[in-house]
Amino acid sequence: MKVSCVSTACFFALGFVLHAQMHRAEQDREITYWLQAPQTHQFRISHDFNVTRLGQSSVHSFVRKGSIVSASAIYDLDTGEKLPVHNVTGKAVNALGYYPAPSPDDMVVVQGDLPHPLAAGESARVRVIETYTDPESYRISNGELTWDRTLARPRNTVVLPAGWFLTEVTVPAIISLDPDGRLMLRFNNPRNDEIHVVLKAKHR
């Protein structure tokens, strides 16, 4: 059932939401999407994660089918260094044996190369920043943008383009403003599967 942005099911909190300090591993649970001008069908993504596997020499960001990835950057958050990045296939990643579930062979995967293979007891924390172009999930019609996407992480933040206001959202959200005055929606997902979010907005 759709939830209007003015209904009581859509929680409005004007101001900034402050997070308590969390353990390093727990911070893998967040992702942020910055919607660009809807005519571009683009949104920026940023998320952090840790890797701890002995001997692992690369990290990966798996691109969802239907999205075209560009402007990829992966940073080592312990050193601030930008890692060398390049696109590989799901087949190539499967051959590494890092992940329990295989990816489709033709999947596009952004790979960042670590400075050295991880030693016993060593970990690396990285930040992935990339741009997705996806006309299917992010589009505009009659002056109203639609962003339609499933979200799997426990904490998901979506930031609207500057000057746009929310008209409709299908999942309850905590709404605030970011430091630049852009409308920001925070979706919490307590389940072990995905939530399907469809939001719509218009320009002021």
Give residue spans per PLM region.
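Non-catalytic C-terminal accessory domains or segments of carbohydrate-active enzymes
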Residues: E26-E30, W34-Q36, M107-D113, P117-A120, ...
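Hydrophobic residues positioned within well-ordered beta-strands of beta-sheet architectures
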Residues: R29-I31, F43-H47, S58, V110, ...
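Extracytoplasmic
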Residues: D28, Q42-R44, G55-S57, V69, ...
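Solvent-exposed beta-hairpin/edge-strand motifs
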Residues: S57-A95, D148-P172
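Positively charged n-region of N-terminal signal peptides that target proteins for export
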Residues: M1-C5
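Bacterial N-terminal signal peptides
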Residues: S7-V17
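Early extracytoplasmic/domain-onset interaction patches
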Residues: Q21-V63
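A surface-exposed beta-strand-loop module
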Residues: A71-I74, G80-T146, D178-R204
